[in-house]
Amino acid sequence: MLILFCADIEIRLIILKSRGYFCSVEEKKLPYKVIGGKPTRIEYSADDVFAKIKQEEIKFIDLQFTSLPGRFHHTTISANTFTPDQMEDGLPKLDGSSIVGFTSIDDSDLILKPDPNSFAIIPWIASKKSARMLCDIYRGAGRGRLETDPRGICQKAEEYLKTQGYDESFWGPEVEFFVFDKIHWDVL
């Protein structure tokens, strides 16, 4: 569930910080706050995002998305070149033929459309302050949403569940990683 996923990341980052791996983590920088022990989503409009970029002196923005096999991808842009039109219309920053399950080489121009509600400052990049937004993926030339965009698939499934009488559902990945104190391996 997405809510638990984000709260879990926050807890893990605090643990890693206590072990000296990362800079400090401020709860307000993540897209969820924990209020009364319950994760609560922070919602942003496009105007809120641009105000936050200016207020927090963000230098770079990671435009993030996933492929069908579940691999997390991103492309980074300079925050000072990011415009409200790009937030509204998307950015032609993706060659779909290079992402497994997206498109063929002859139809590869895709558009990343940032979701302002997914805006979050990346707390472990302190020197060149960065933020991220998850993106929806569209075909170029106004041809609509990419059918194999995992976010789009989840959104369609969520809408279908609503038509079946379910009020609420939670969707999202679970990020897994390991931190080792020591690693040893033999090389032939």
Task: Write out the residue ranges for each language-model feature.
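Short, positively charged and aromatic/hydrophobic N-terminal segments
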Residues: 3-4, 8-17, 21
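ATP/Mg2+-dependent ligation/transfer catalytic cores
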Residues: 20-188
